[in-house]
A protein has these predicted regions:
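Conserved alpha-helix/loop element of class I SAM-dependent methyltransferases that forms part
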Residues: 32-66, 77-84
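Conserved SAM/SAH-binding beta-strand->alpha-helix loop
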Residues: 97
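Conserved SAM-binding loop
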Residues: 104-105
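A short acidic, Gly/Pro-enriched loop at the edge of an enzyme's catalytic core
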Residues: 133-141, 152-177
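A short glycine-rich, Lys/Arg-flanked "PGG" loop and its adjoining helix->strand segment in the class I
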Residues: 192-207
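Short alpha-helix
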Residues: 236-251
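C-terminal lobe and adjacent flexible extensions of AdoMet/dcAdoMet transferase-like proteins
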Residues: 250-391
């Protein structure tokens, strides 16, 4: 069996394995998952049989969401999500494999008729490059064949045009990005771009809900070179802690491990591979402004440290910028903090930059009614950098 030596080799190995999986059920690609049975009756059996996932990110969707499913395959998660988000929501599946797309697109009208609304569409693209619509590019290539360097340059120009004028998925256009055991199929060289693309397409306040396979230690090179193991969701798996760190590097906050299987799915060369589901949020970018707000961390831990190294002692009023105040008021932090508004509201148009240094001046009338701020009478600051949008 030939070994993998490039991202193209990885893509070919995955395409061949999943094209076969579209034609005939591949049990080795399945990781047992308990789905909500209420949503399965409307889905054709040929789709259910070709479920090659390892989790159920649809459990974390809400009515009205616009959802993007990366590596949508036969469409099972999309069709479940369609029912969860309802007629007011929308679901977009993206996959590169023509055989899987044909299966999903063929099932879509059947599901729509059974549930009473049609809010699912399937698009062709690479999940690490959500700007290029490959159906549109295929159509262009049909009448503009590439035969030499000159026509290759024309192809590259068309790709740039598609990115700018007709992106497959536009910036900030979805509420939730889900994926079910697919990120590990992307070549290592393209994984950083993949996370950047997830971040790009999410709206501010949106979330990524990713189920995938992770490993206890970094996968060694000899396993990464095995096409059978790569297309089987093993060789491309993130090491467990590195998977969480990838969300942070991409700019997400509130990275939350919501499910981790205690029993490994597989053990290869002594390395455990198991399913996890992670939720991460977008929206901490931007400058920090001082609206005279504070929060109290309620416990149970003595002190907590957030992703930007802001420190919150239990029970101690802590000044925060307006952006952080908003973030701590919603998931995944809702309920962990008591929110303290100032007695006199601050005009956002004139609010100063949030000063992270200790203060020695007396409090102003904009201070919260029940506390005074920072060093003056014991109110601490969470810290950070006001000018770079630290929090």
């Amino acid at each position: 069996m030939p070994s993998l030596s490039s991202p193209t080799d990885v893509e070919i190995a995955v395409a061949q394995r999943y094209s076969a999986g579209a034609q005939e059920v591949q049990p080795a690609l399945c990781c047992p998952v308990d789905y909500d049975q209420r949503f399965l009756a409307a889905i054709p059996e040929e789709v259910l049989e070709r479920d090659y996932g390892c989790g159920d990110p649809s459990r974390y969707l809400v009515e009205g969401d616009t959802v993007l499913d990366l590596g949508s395959g036969a469409g099972k998660i999309c069709f479940i999500a369609s029912q969860v988000v309802g007629a007011a929501g929308r679901v977009i599946g993206v996959d590169l494999n023509d055989d899987m797309l044909a299966l999903a697109r063929g099932a879509a009208p059947v599901v729509a008729q059974r549930i009473g609304h049609r809010n699912v569409e399937f698009r062709k693209g690479r999940i690490q490059d959500l700007a290029v619509d490959l159906d549109a590019l295929d159509g262009w290539l049909a009448s503009h064949p590439v035969t030499d360097v000159s026509t290759l340059a024309t192809l590259e120009a068309e790709q740039r045009r598609l990115r700018a004028e007709q992106p497959l998925v536009a910036d900030g256009s979805v509420d939730a990005v889900v994926s079910n055991c697919v990120l590990n199929l992307v070549a290592t060289e393209h994984k950083a771009q993949l996370f950047a693309e997830i971040f790009r397409v999410l709206r501010r306040g949106g979330r990524a809900v990713i189920s995938d396979i992770v490993s206890t230690v970094e996968v060694p090179d000899h396993l990464r070179a095995d096409p059978e193991l790569w297309s089987g969701c093993i060789s491309g798996a993130y090491q467990e802690e590195a998977f969480l760190a990838a969300f942070e590097r991409a700019g997400f906050y509130g990275v939350h491990l919501v499910k981790r299987d205690s029993t490994p799915w597989r053990v290869v060369d002594g390395i455990e591979f198991r399913s996890v589901t992670v939720i991460a949020y977008k929206g901490k970018q931007g400058e920090c402004r001082d609206h005279g707000q504070a929060v109290i961390y309620c416990g149970p831990f003595k002190t907590v440290l957030d992703d930007d190294e802001h420190v919150f002692p239990r029970g101690v009023p802590t000044a925060v910028c307006a952006k952080s105040f908003e973030i701590y008021s919603r998931q995944p932090y809702a309920g962990a903090f008591q929110l303290l508004e100032p007695a006199v509201a601050v005009d956002p148009a004139t609010a100063p930059l949030f000063d992270c240094a200790p203060q020695t001046a007396p409090p102003t009338p904009t201070e919260p009614a029940s506390v005074v701020r920072r060093a003056v009478s014991g109110l601490t600051t969470a810290g950070g950098n006001a000018t770079t949008g630290c929090c």
